[in-house]
């Protein structure tokens, strides 16, 4: 239960951190889409561990294998299965955590729900589960580009109290990928990297905010009431490990404005299209895309597994102390960027297919 996401473009992820591998099955991908393992690998490389000095030192190539659904470089319209095998596992690092719960991790809640858990690396609750999401997101991104020239770009907006100045309307992928923290504000990026390194040396962790923009989203994507576009995006990104907050457009800052100040006034552009002067709605009104850029932010908490000693309890209910071992990110934000992009792309791709299926038939 809870392992499948989407309606027409639907994914099911599988696997655990220290099991044989992780992956995804994608249902509903249109046939005849040209896709290669290399295109998927580009996205996986952006989220893989061990990519820089500020990420987990776990060394995984995360090489993807397309097992089904693609023939001679084109999708068949049948389920696409993608597998990434785990290579650099160290289950012995987690022996102590078989009995001791990590504070603010999923250990205790998984035990409460299932009565059993794979304690090696967090099992299913590990961020390695997101490999399947990012692989599927690579395919969703290609569909969006090919059909509607949609581009989805995420970046680190804030690390702890360091907040970058970035224009979501003009930011480019090259700017995002110009440094290891994935903050397009180059000057602040250096300070972010230094802060992450310093925190990691102290055996601690920090969080922050990823901002994401989707440009050229067709007007009309989204559904009324329960399947509003922003509601589906919120569910998608809030299902990511360590996510703790979501806002779109003006977000919580919009509560400080009056209606006159907040409303996005309309005008007709040079092509005769209805546009808005401002974009405090974040590209969505009434749950439906209005053609402006969709701009959202996701808050990620500090990584739960840290080397500093903390109070905790055992499975048997005894109070104890834990200084966690293992290899963990001192800050999840740099690797969370492609995860957020993937989830936004999956939602937009699903709604694109739903919109065409209902509103482009007659």
UniProtKB/Swiss-Prot annotation:
- Enzymatic class: lyase
Known cofactor(s) = FMNH2
Describe the protein's quaternary organization and the partners it interacts with: Homotetramer.
**Protein source organism:** Nostoc sp. (strain PCC 7120 / SAG 25.82 / UTEX 2576)
Biological process GO annotation list?
amino acid biosynthetic process; aromatic amino acid family biosynthetic process; chorismate biosynthetic process
Q: Which GO terms describe its cellular component?
A: cytosol
The cofactor remark states:
Reduced FMN (FMNH(2)).
Origin: domain of life: Bacteria
Question: Quick check: keyword 4Fe-4S in the entry?
Answer: no
Metabolic or biological pathway, per its Swiss-Prot or TrEMBL entry: Metabolic intermediate biosynthesis; chorismate biosynthesis; chorismate from D-erythrose 4-phosphate and phosphoenolpyruvate: step 7/7
* Record function comment: This reaction introduces a second double bond into the aromatic ring system.
Q: What's the catalysed reaction?
A: 5-O-(1-carboxyvinyl)-3-phosphoshikimate = chorismate + phosphate
Q: Which protein, by its recorded name, is this? A: Chorismate synthase
EC number per UniProt: 4.2.3.5
Ordered alphabetically, the record's keywords are: Amino-acid biosynthesis, Aromatic amino acid biosynthesis, FAD, Flavoprotein, FMN, Lyase, NADP
Q: Name one GO molecular function term.
A: FMN binding
Record's family? Belongs to the chorismate synthase family.
Gene behind the chain: aroC
Q: Which InterPro entries match?
A: Chorismate_synth, Chorismate_synth_AroC_sf, Chorismate_synthase_CS
Q: Which residues are involved in binding NADP(+)?
A: 47
User: Which positions are annotated as binding FMN?
Assistant: 124-126, 286, 301-305, 327
Please give the CDD domains that the UniProt record associates with this protein. Answer: Chorismate_synthase
